[in-house]
Curated annotation (Swiss-Prot):
It comes from Flavobacterium psychrophilum (strain ATCC 49511 / DSM 21280 / CIP 103535 / JIP02/86). The lineage of its organism: Bacteria, Pseudomonadati, Bacteroidota, Flavobacteriia, Flavobacteriales. One of its GO terms (molecular function) is structural constituent of ribosome. Belongs to the bacterial ribosomal protein bL36 family. Keywords: Ribonucleoprotein, Ribosomal protein. One of its GO terms (biological process) is translation. NCBIfam families: PRK00831.1, rpmJ_bact. This is Large ribosomal subunit protein bL36. The gene is rpmJ. It comes from the Bacteria. GO terms for cellular component: ribonucleoprotein complex; ribosome.
Length: 38
């Protein structure tokens, strides 16, 4: 999980999800792309 100031979709499989007021990027196919907005 990377914490970034700005989160972007790094592949077409990435999904942007809002949980508890934070933005997350999740990717089932390639979990390396997981991110959270700091």
């Amino acid at each position: 999980m990377k914490v970034r100031a700005s989160v972007k979709k790094r592949s077409p499989e990435c999904k942007i999800v809002r949980r508890k007021g934070r933005l997350y990027v999740i990717n089932k196919k390639n979990p390396r792309f997981k991110q959270r907005q700091g």
